[in-house]
Amino acid sequence: MNIRTASFTFIVVMMILSQTMADRFFNEPEEDDHLVESWNPFKKIAHRHCYPKNECITTNGKKTCKDYSCCQIVLFGKKTRSACTVVAQ
């Protein structure tokens, strides 16, 4: 095997492995707490970004508000969709 074939094989294998790891983060945002914690030394590569969100609805002159806590995973600078949970009504 010459150097070009070895380099090409290495690049293909690295792309497959990185896609497999990224797929875990992007498809399972609710169940990945243990994965993010295991990546703590690599916070610049993968970390969780949480922020508060407030949503108010006015119905028949009565205003009701809900507070949410929304979190998303940032992996290599790309953000996943937010998963929000109700904190208070």
Curated annotation (Swiss-Prot):
The modification 6'-bromotryptophan is found at W39. Residues 1-22 form the signal peptide. The keyword Signal applies. Residues 23-38 form a propeptide. Keywords: Antibiotic, Antimicrobial, Bromination, Disulfide bond, Fungicide, Signal. One of its GO terms (biological process) is killing of cells of another organism. The keyword Disulfide bond applies. Contains 3 disulfide bonds. Disulfide bonds: none annotated. Has antimicrobial activity against Gram-negative bacteria and Gram-positive bacteria with minimum inhibitory concentration (MIC) between 0.78 uM and 3.13 uM. This is Strongylocin 2.
